[in-house]
Amino acid sequence: MASGICNLLKPPGMTSRQAVTRVARLTGEKAGHAGTLDPQACGVLPILLGKATRLFDFVASEHKQYLAEICFGVATDTLDAAGSVVASGGRVPSLQEVLDLLPSFLGSSLQTPPAYSARKVDGVRAYKLAREGAAPVLAPHRICIDALTHVAQTDY
């Protein structure tokens, strides 16, 4: 029996659970994931194999890095690119305004996940409830942002 951690680049359109199931079938090992990515998200999903599944609490609590793309002037009903546009237009902030604002996001704070998130409410993914017309209530959780860096800007 092999044990270890596989960092899988999960494609959009696949749930974290589906990714784990595929890896488990390919390896023949017990598998679990350390954290959940929303189905439409693309990103690294740490998959624990065999005896390494016991390390979940240690791996899941480690610091993570994200690369985000922001589109100013568009709002969707799901708060992500998968939703329907509910508003558009308005003033787009200058690069300097964005750079000046970044430090205000640093540190520890409480964050309430959006209704269309992979968080669970009574054992059901919030995005499933929201798609069925329910309004899931998600409890805020503590987040900590250690660093923010502007990488690039594209004007469309």
Stretches with model-predicted labels:
Residues 1-156:
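Catalytic/RNA-binding core of pseudouridine synthases
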